[in-house]
């Protein structure tokens, strides 16, 4: 692989602790058996909620399918003084100087077009796995031709879009190619308010979904999958209750491809419809939707990246050095408490073919187990 100018390339098989307070590891989480049966593994990976309402469910259709790809994973941790730690300091002695550790991993090497192909295949596979599990699956072409489905996607959010998590973590969310994303879990506050106003007029995406289910006499299925490349764990920013001092700041990272998600059913038998403002509205009774979700992510031990590079910028290093110096001087002077910043950035260089193959296999395994568990709940 070509080295980036000024960047340190880290071996994909041997990562060390590179920054004080930041431990990096490639230890492998337990992976599922891709060659084993879904039924025998489902209980180890999939949990069921409201599964009793699967009784009688046969004719189904996938009304939404969204795949979220992790592209940026971040976490932070910090040291902190406990309750009254400064008040108990003797006059004229050094004040406490704390540090905040910030670590970011960015995935590079796979573009949106490839992610879209993975999402398309995962959504097609969802229908296949439901059929293999014994459900009567209405083809997507039939659903797509329905005017309620078209109206639902006219109210959705354009795909792909960036979803921002905590501490700078970022994901790309993609639906089926050429279709929008209508699941409220992916819609931000502004769009959510917009949907609420539309609901008053009977035109929200969810209401179109309800009418579609009634029109085609099917149980709606909503599929959500997350493909992530890194799992970061922080030891936090303060001790429990804040009474004791916290003298460590650590972020642990596991670089491993994993899939998680859920498959939600909206049983037609639990749907209630009524008329409001001259329009029919339909919804599933509260707490009557069976959901089959991962309790443990499906992970693979197979390699999907070529290397990991330290891409901490000069600006990051200057900021870290400046805040550490300032914190030391402030503490020594006894004039103020201060927090230094320690910033580190890594780039995970993906192997497109490996990332593609492993992502598809993980998504397929998740869907097969969820469909199997759903079928056995009927």
Whereabouts are the PLM-identified features?
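A structural "domain/chain start" motif
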Residues: 23-121, 125-138, 143-178, 183-256, ...
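Bacterial N-terminal signal peptides that target proteins for export
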Residues: 2-11
């Amino acid at each position: 692989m070509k080295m980036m100018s000024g960047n340190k390339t880290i071996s994909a098989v041997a990562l060390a602790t590179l920054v004080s307070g930041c431990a990096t590891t490639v230890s492998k989480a337990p992976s599922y058996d891709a060659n084993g049966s879904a039924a025998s593994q489902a209980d180890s990976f999939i949990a069921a909620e409201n599964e009793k309402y699967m009784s009688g469910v046969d004719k189904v259709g996938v009304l939404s399918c969204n795949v979220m790809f992790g592209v940026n994973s971040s976490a932070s941790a910090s040291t902190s003084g406990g309750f009254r730690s400064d008040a108990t300091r003797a006059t004229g002695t050094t004040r406490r100087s704390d540090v905040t550790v910030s670590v970011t991993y960015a995935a590079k090497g796979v573009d949106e077009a490839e992610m879209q192909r993975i999402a398309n295949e995962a959504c097609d596979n969802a229908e296949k796995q439901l059929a293999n599990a014994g459900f009567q699956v209405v083809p997507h072409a039939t659903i797509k031709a329905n005017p309620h489905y078209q109206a639902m996607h006219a109210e959705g959010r354009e795909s792909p879009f960036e979803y921002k998590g905590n501490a700078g973590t970022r994901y790309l969310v993609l639906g089926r190619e050429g279709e929008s994303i209508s699941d409220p879990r992916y819609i931000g506050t502004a769009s959510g308010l917009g949907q609420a106003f539309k609901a008053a007029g009977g035109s929200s995406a969810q209401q179109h979904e309800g009418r579609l289910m009634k029109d085609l006499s099917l149980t709606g299925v909503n599929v959500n999958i997350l493909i992530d490349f890194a799992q970061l764990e922080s030891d936090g920013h303060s001790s429990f209750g804040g009474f004791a001092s916290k003298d460590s700041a650590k972020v642990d990272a596991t670089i491993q491809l994993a899939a998680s998600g859920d498959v939600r059913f909206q049983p037609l038998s639990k749907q209630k419809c009524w008329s409001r403002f001259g329009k029919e509205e339909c919804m599933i009774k509260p707490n009557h939707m069976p959901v089959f979700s991962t309790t443990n992510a499906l992970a693979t031990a197979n390699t999907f990246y070529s290397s990991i590079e330290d891409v901490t910028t000069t600006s990051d290093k200057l900021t870290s050095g400046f805040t550490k110096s300032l914190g030391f001087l402030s503490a020594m002077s006894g004039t103020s408490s201060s927090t230094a910043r320690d910033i580190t950035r890594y780039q995970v260089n993906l192997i497109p073919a490996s990332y593609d193959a492993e992502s598809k296999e993980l998504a397929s395994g998740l869907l097969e187990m969820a469909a199997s568990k759903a079928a056995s709940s009927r």
